[in-house]
């Protein structure tokens, strides 16, 4: 036998069944000389795009198929013979998946009728299963085979005879199949482990579910010849020959119904663009902008993407009609057409951007437009898309959730029978998202013997499992919308969320096969900005503030930013950003663009940050390698900071076409994962030498490009974000009460909890008023104080566990008449005992019943009343004298119920004890010189570990005077893991570092002082 085609093979997209990736399977199939390989994951095409890419790489023909089992029916392998067969297969999988909950399927006999044209079927029967033969023959006339799967079992000879006899009785051709679950025999242990995981059993108890041997791998041709009759092997090639379908045959069209009569997509897009030009530039667009728009419209028309732009414009138009704040970002911000259509907010007159980063002729790939919407109202936009286009033509893309270190080791350890306490301890040795095996030192610290055979087996299998698909989840908002039913392109299944459906491919798969998507994303800052505008309009009336009407280039705003007074400000509120601000000292909008981008892995790893700062501060001359490149790098003082600059450099210095430059960008983004950047070294060097640049300069540029790795930040993305950075900064500087109030009402979002946001507001002299049923709404609100900044009234939403519907009833009853006492409140607002107890414990009844102790006593006599007796007389009881709660009791209750306090900061109450420990307050660090040893203590506000920090973690501590940034090196974090991860009140001994107005403490020793809090519930925001 010179060739063979495997017709039944599962990849690791048959979750917890297949033990090899498509790339591993096709690489081995190529080495073994297979003619073709079918990927037949169970009721799924989730992995088929990756299989298609692997098949092209290894030059082995891909057969597209799926394994299914009918409810109370036979098991089949279905293969797509042609495009019609592929579409039938997609529809069948969709029916089975939509009928069942996420992660499962139900296919019935009637789903195979009428006949599935273009689908070949292999019946995986047992000897003697004659009953289904005639029925299956009707379902698949001339397209049905009997599959013979032999795995060197003791009964192989009898099984072969029985199956051949069944084939003869049913008048069906027989064909060899492998039921392949792994590319090589060495994966058997992993396959056994995955089977145990799938069945929630340890391997030692999973015997009935495990395969008898390791034969379900891709076997050499010689081995197959010794197992199967030649005719059965030859039949595999005949079936492979009949399967002519290739994913390249898919024809995708974007919806066209948005175009009114009398127009085609091109003319309607031009009409809307012209309308947008008049709105964006009332005095007329410049010749430069006009030229750019004409260039873009011509290319959009040439590539046939008009309907895509119209669809995105329609979605954004809906949001604006509903007063939902939104903004396009990413590469779409490079487009003047997108700005004219209202999709993006970045004026091409304001910043010079590169359209080819978004769309190019050479790249021949669809554009990708990301639009951010208010996070609290995005669901309205998502349901609009579903309703406008229907479930048949719109669905979210999937995200392939993969195994990472802690999750993988937990599943493997359970499967190998480790007791629960050891499973937890071992998982804790691994970072949640880290894929590296824990060090021997870390294992020993946790009580494990690194030389233990069982432990080594667990870690070895974990290493194989890491990176495997675990399940499909839904993309946060990536929509695929089609002119034709989506299930003719890809199977569609239910998402875990109600009223959501997802396709089985993720965003990377879409790029490979040319499907367009629009990202309907959520951004908390947009919610906060809209809430700020609402609060100010309610407070003062007049013309409503908007993003467009915020005064630009305000010196007071930039002065605040340069002081790093940016808690709550979009993109520049992290400790790393705040440490950079006094060094960079932004003075204009483009400085903010750089600030947003510079504290990123790309510039840091490419060693671009310090040269830029030195040049900006006049400590190093600004130099350019040529006059031509001065135009490229002038805006960043000769230092490449953005992806677009790398593209422009390649175009100007090495004669790349715009499309080739974008291919360089894509290679740059993927080289750490897939390699593929080296071929650009020779191309860049050759082009730069030909244009008169020095070889060492070309080499240095290439190393900087590698430094960008997968983290190079797009200028368009930074510029879009900088718009929101400036808007939020302006609000914090000029309307701090409204901004803080809006942030709290929009929480969870950002780096800081409501407690830290309120502490910051108080440091800015903003008055904060307590939760009070006589005044509080559900949301926090503003209360005027003469000409000063208004006070923030805490809302009932601050009370942990309090229901919004109860708050709405309180508001409604209060509008009719003020409450006279607790009984009146409970009766007219219809509050149950639980709601009243929460209000009492939160101090929200102080105005009706007194302090917390009195309020608790008062509600003890409130009984829910039937309507018949609602207006009856009430017996008055004599007042009871109850003691005032102590300051400590008040503090504990505040944090337990509200997560914050309007009383003294917790550390103010502990300051005497902290002084006894020789801990300095944060304000004492201001006057101290660089290099001094210090001891500090504070509440842990958050822990951050940037991707570029080589294991460094930044811990933010807060005391009654402010915040301190603490740097914890990896070794210290490992040595003192418990106080590092678990402390809520942390003492740090270390060394003060001070430079350019930035201070932080390099930790040398950590100590957990949490017991001093005596039950105080203070929560940090960690690793988000």
Curated annotation (Swiss-Prot):
MF terms (GO), sorted A to Z: 3'-5' exonuclease activity; DNA-directed DNA polymerase activity; nucleic acid binding
The protein's matches in InterPro entries, at most eight in alphabetical order, are given as:
DNA_pol3_alpha_NTPase_dom, DNA_pol3_finger, DnaE2, DnaE2/DnaE/PolC, DNAPol_HHH, NA-bd_OB_tRNA, PHP_dom, Pol/His_phosphatase_N
Which SMART domains does this one have? POLIIIAc (SM00481)
Q: Which UniProt keywords apply?
A: Cytoplasm, DNA damage, DNA repair, DNA replication, DNA-directed DNA polymerase, Nucleotidyltransferase, Transferase
Indicate where this protein is primarily found.
Answer: cytoplasm
Provide the protein's localization: Cytoplasm
What biological-process GO terms show up in the record? DNA repair; DNA replication
Q: Which reaction does it catalyse?
A: DNA(n) + a 2'-deoxyribonucleoside 5'-triphosphate = DNA(n+1) + diphosphate
- EC number(s) on file: 2.7.7.7
Question: What does the entry list under GO cellular component?
Answer: cytoplasm
**Residue ranges crossing the lipid bilayer per the database entry:** none
Q: What class of enzyme is it?
A: transferase
One Pfam family assigned to this protein is: DNA_pol3_alpha
Its function, per the record, reads:
DNA polymerase involved in damage-induced mutagenesis and translesion synthesis (TLS). It is not the major replicative DNA polymerase.
Similarity annotation: Belongs to the DNA polymerase type-C family. DnaE2 subfamily.
The protein's matches in NCBIfam families, at most eight in alphabetical order, are given as: polc, PRK05672.1
Q: What's the protein name?
A: Error-prone DNA polymerase
Q: Which organism is it from?
A: Pseudomonas paraeruginosa (strain DSM 24068 / PA7)
């Amino acid at each position: 036998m010179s060739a063979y085609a495997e017709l039944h093979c599962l990849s690791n997209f048959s979750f917890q069944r297949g033990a090899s990736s498509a790339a591993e399977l096709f690489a081995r199939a190529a080495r073994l000389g297979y003619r073709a390989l079918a990927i037949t994951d169970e009721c799924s095409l989730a992995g088929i795009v990756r299989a298609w890419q692997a098949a092209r790489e290894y030059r082995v023909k891909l057969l597209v198929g799926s394994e299914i089992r009918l409810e109370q029916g036979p098991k089949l392998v279905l293969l797509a013979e042609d495009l019609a067969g592929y579409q039938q297969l997609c529809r069948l999988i969709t029916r089975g998946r939509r009928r069942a909950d996420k992660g499962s399927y139900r296919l019935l006999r009637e789903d195979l009728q009428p006949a599935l044209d273009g689908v070949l079927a292999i019946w995986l029967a047992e000897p003697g299963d004659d009953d289904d033969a005639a029925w299956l023959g009707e379902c698949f006339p001339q397209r049905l085979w009997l599959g013979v799967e032999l795995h060197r079992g003791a009964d192989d000879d009898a099984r072969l005879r029985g199956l051949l006899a069944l084939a003869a009785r049913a008048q069906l051709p027989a064909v060899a199949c492998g039921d392949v679950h792994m590319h090589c025999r060495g994966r058997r242990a992993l396959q056994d482990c995955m089977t145990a995981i799938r069945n929630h059993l340890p391997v030692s108890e999973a015997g009935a579910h495990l395969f008898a041997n390791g034969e379900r791998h891709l076997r050499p041709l010689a081995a197959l010849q010794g197992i199967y009759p030649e005719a059965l092997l030859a039949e595999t090639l005949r079936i492979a020959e009949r399967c002519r379908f290739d994913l390249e045959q898919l024809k995708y069209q974007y919806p066209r119904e948005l175009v009114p009569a009398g127009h085609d997509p091109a003319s309607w897009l031009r009409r809307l663009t012209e309308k947008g030009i008049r709105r964006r530039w009332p005095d007329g667009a410049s010749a430069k902008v006009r030229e750019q728009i004409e260039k873009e419209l011509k290319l959009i028309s040439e590539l046939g993407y008009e309907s895509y732009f119209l669809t995105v414009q329609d979605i954004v138009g809906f949001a604006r009609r509903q007063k939902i704040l939104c903004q396009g970002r990413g590469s779409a911000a490079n487009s003047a057409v997108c700005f004219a259509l209202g999709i993006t907010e970045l004026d091409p007159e304001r910043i010079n951007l590169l359209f080819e980063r978004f769309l190019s002729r050479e790249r021949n790939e669809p554009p990708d437009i990301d639009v951010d919407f208010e996070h609290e109202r995005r669901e309205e936009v998502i349901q609009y898309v579903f309703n406008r286009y229907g479930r048949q033509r719109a669905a979210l893309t999937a995200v392939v959730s993969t195994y990472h270190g802690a999750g993988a080791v937990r599943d493997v350890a359970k499967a190998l029978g480790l007791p629960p306490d050891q499973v937890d301890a071992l998982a804790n040795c691994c970072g949640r998202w880290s894929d590296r095996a824990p060090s021997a030192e870390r294992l020993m610290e946790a009580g494990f013997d690194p030389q233990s055979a069982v432990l080594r087996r667990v870690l070895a299998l974990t290493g194989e499992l890491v990176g495997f698909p675990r399940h499909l989840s839904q993309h946060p908002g990536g929509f695929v919308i089609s002119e034709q039913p989506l299930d003719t392109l890809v199977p569609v299944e239910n998402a875990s969320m109600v009223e959501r459906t997802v396709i089985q491919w993720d965003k990377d798969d879409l790029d490979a096969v040319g499907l367009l998507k629009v990202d309907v994303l959520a951004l908390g800052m947009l919610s906060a900005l809209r809430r700020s505008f609402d609060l100010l309009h309610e407070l003062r009336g007049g013309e409503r503030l908007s993003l467009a009407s915020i005064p630009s280039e305000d010196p007071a705003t930039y002065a605040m930013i340069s002081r790093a007074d940016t808690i709550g400000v979009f993109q520049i509120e992290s400790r790393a950003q705040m440490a950079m601000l006094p060094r960079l000292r932004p003075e204009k909008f483009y400085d903010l663009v750089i600030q947003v981008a510079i504290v990123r892995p790309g510039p840091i790893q490419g060693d671009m940050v310090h040269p830029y700062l030195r040049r900006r501060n006049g400590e190093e001359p600004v130099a350019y390698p040529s006059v031509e490149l001065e135009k490229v790098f002038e805006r960043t003082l000769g230092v490449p900071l953005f992806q677009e600059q790398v593209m422009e450099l390649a175009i100007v210095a090495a004669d790349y076409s715009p499309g080739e430059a974008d291919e360089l960008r894509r290679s740059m983004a993927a080289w750490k994962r897939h390699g593929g950047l080296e071929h650009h070294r020779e191309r860049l060097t050759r082009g730069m030498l030909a244009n008169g640049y020095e070889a060492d300069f070309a080499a240095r540029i290439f190393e900087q490009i590698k430094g960008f790795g997968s983290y190079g930040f797009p200028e368009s993305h930074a510029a879009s974000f900088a718009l929101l950075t400036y808007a939020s900064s302006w609000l914090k500087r000029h309307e701090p009460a409204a901004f803080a109030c809006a942030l709290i009402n929009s929480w969870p979002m950002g780096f800081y909890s409501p407690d830290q946001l309120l502490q910051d507001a108080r440091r800015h002299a903003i008055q904060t008023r307590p939760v009070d049923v006589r005044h509080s709404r559900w949301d926090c609100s503003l209360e005027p104080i003469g000409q000063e900044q208004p006070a923030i009234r805490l809302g009932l939403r601050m009370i942990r566990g309090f229901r919004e519907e109860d708050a709405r009833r309180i508001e409604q009853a209060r509008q009719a008449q003020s409450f006279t006492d607790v009984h009146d409140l409970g009766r007219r607002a219809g509050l149950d005992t639980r709601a009243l107890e929460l209000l009492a414990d939160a101090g929200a009844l102080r105005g009706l019943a007194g302090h917390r102790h009195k309020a608790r006593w008062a509600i003890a006599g409130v009984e829910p009343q039937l309507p018949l007796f609602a207006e009856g007389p009430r017996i008055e009881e004599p007042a009871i004298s109850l003691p005032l709660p102590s300051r400590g009791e008040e503090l504990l209750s505040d944090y337990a119920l509200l997560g914050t306090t309007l009383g003294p900061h917790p550390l103010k109450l502990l300051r005497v004890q902290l002084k006894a420990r020789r801990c300095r307050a944060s304000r004492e660090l201001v006057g101290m010189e660089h290099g001094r040893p210090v001891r500090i203590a504070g509440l842990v506000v958050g822990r951050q570990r940037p991707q570029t920090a080589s294991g460094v973690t930044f811990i933010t501590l807060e005391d009654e005077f402010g915040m301190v940034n603490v740097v914890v090196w990896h070794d210290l974090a490992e040595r003192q893991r418990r106080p590092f991860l678990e402390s809520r009140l942390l003492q740090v001994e270390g060394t003060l570092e001070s430079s350019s107005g930035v201070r932080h403490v390099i930790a040398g020793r950590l100590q957990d002082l949490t017991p001093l809090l005596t039950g105080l519930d203070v929560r940090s925001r960690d690793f988000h």
